[in-house]
Amino acid sequence: MITNERIVSYLHSLEKGNGDFLDNLRVYAEANNVPIIRKEMESFLKVMIDLRKPSSILEIGTAIGYSSIFMAMSSEETCHITTIENYDKRIPVAKGNFVKAGMDERITLMEGDALDKLKELVDNKAKFDMVFIDAAKSWYMEYLMEVFKLTEPGALIISDNVLQEGELSESRYAIERRNRTIHGKMREFLYNIKNMENLDTTIIPLGDGVAMSWRKQ
């Protein structure tokens, strides 16, 4: 948590909920330690979808399908979501949730390693208006390199959990040794997206940190 918990609790109290299905799915995820987007991230995503009005969204990291369904519900009925997941135990749960939510026609789940599936999409000349990255943090830079091939100028790229509970502000020597690799790779990722000429990026201390990048060229 990188923001004051009392403030976050207050902001959560203002939310009106997402309907019984998603609200119950959140309860299930929290009870089973399944990582899903935070409530404050939901509001951010919804506003970005309302502003960008994408016709196609790519999600890297499905888990049990919560954010896929949320984005489908928040977008136009003509918008299609492609999502990638490699954890075998969560894939059938996500697929079942898509059916239960009535979103299985609007969401395509690709099973396997994210980088491999991104390259497959590149080979198939797929294009997306919006990309949501929420998978293995140490691979964000590699994902982004493939995402560039899957987007055009005007695309919106959102990367979640980029501040690592605030640890990114610490020296690598203050970080537990087992976390130093991801610490270094995420710092490299943030430096790159802030300095790339083809991106305008803002990094916001929302939830666990979110980077919003607008592709200029």
Whereabouts are the PLM-identified features?
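A short alpha-helical cap/connector motif
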Residues: M1-M130, K137-I158, V162-Q217
